[in-house]
UniProtKB/Swiss-Prot annotation:
Cellular compartment(s): Cytoplasm, Myofibril, Sarcomere, Z line
Xref: InterPro entries: F-box-like_dom_sf, F-box_dom, F-box_LRR-repeat, Leu-rich_rpt_Cys-con_subtyp, LRR_dom_sf
Name used for this protein in its record: F-box and leucine-rich protein 22
Pfam (any one): F-box-like
Purpose: Substrate-recognition component of the SCF (SKP1-CUL1-F-box protein)-type E3 ubiquitin ligase complex. Promotes ubiquitination of sarcomeric proteins alpha-actinin-2 (ACTN2) and filamin-C (FLNC).
Residue ranges annotated for the F-box domain, each copy included: 1-46
Pathway: Protein modification; protein ubiquitination
Tagged with keyword Repeat: yes
First and last residues of every LRR repeat: 15-40, 43-72, 98-123, 124-149, 150-175, 176-201
Organism: Mus musculus
CDD domains: F-box_FBXL22
């Protein structure tokens, strides 16, 4: 029996066992298999392990998408996490090649995938509060949002969760240095039933513009009998 003699249900099952590249390669063999590749029901889950994968044409976005993860574990993540005003020309050049990729991709998700229920972003140092706020508005069924080592995420994302994350049940903002303890406490007060994790976030040093850094250092050195206060960590 030739593969094209299988019915649609069998072909979808067969495709479901293949990775994205293999699905794309098989779809190029004939129009029938290309139609299977284009079937939205084939794409309820999407997992990306590098930002380069976001630019490929080996997947499809549709209202059938339920779970999305973008996990970038690369040495370049450390470069992305450096404060913009501290980056060298070389580091800025490296970031310019990919800094808009995740935000642009998530905007496509907002437009095409309204039924999304779970999003995980790890090592996405350029994803912004505005982009996440739009995601929460565009995907009202979102139940789980996991953010890890996303340097540009701030208390504005927490405020967006409180305002727009009506279906959200679980939020992780782990190792996100610009999320503060005060912001987490406000979110906890606004959403007492939310399962909230902020591993190390409130204990990390947030970004400070050069002038704020100098002023803070001057005030600290001038303060008599200064004492260090412990930062809260873990779940809130």
């Amino acid at each position: 029996m030739h593969i094209t003699q299988l019915n649609r249900e069998c072909l979808l099952c067969l495709f479901s066992f293949l990775d994205k590249d293999s699905r794309r390669s098989l779809s190029r063999t004939c129009s029938q298999l290309r139609d299977v590749f284009e079937d939205p029901t084939l794409w309820p889950l999407l997992h990306f392990h590098s930002l380069a994968e976001l630019k490929k044409d080996n997947f499809r976005l549709s209202p059938a998408l339920r779970s999305l993860s973008i996990c970038w574990h690369s040495s370049r993540v450390q470069v992305c996490s450096i404060e913009d005003w501290l980056k060298s020309a070389l580091q800025r050049s490296i970031c310019s090649q990919h800094e808009s990729l995740v935000n642009d991709f998530l905007l496509q998700v907002c437009n095409r995938c309204p039924n999304l229920t779970s999003v995980t972003l790890s090592g996405c140092g350029h994803v912004t509060d505005d982009c996440l706020a739009r995601l929460l508005l565009s995907c009202p069924r979102l139940r789980t949002l996991r953010l890890e080592n996303c340097a540009r995420v701030t208390n504005r994302t927490l405020a967006a969760v409180a305002a727009h994350g009506r279906a959200l049940q679980t939020l992780h903002v782990d190792f996100c240095r610009n999320v503060s303890a005060a912001g987490l406490l406000r979110l906890r007060a606004a959403c007492p039933n939310l399962r909230l994790s902020a591993e190390r976030s409130a204990a990390m040093i947030p970004d400070q513009p050069p002038r704020a850094r100098v002023c803070a250092a001057s005030a600290f050195s001038a303060a008599p009998g200064r004492q260090s206060m412990p930062h809260p960590t873990g779940s809130y």
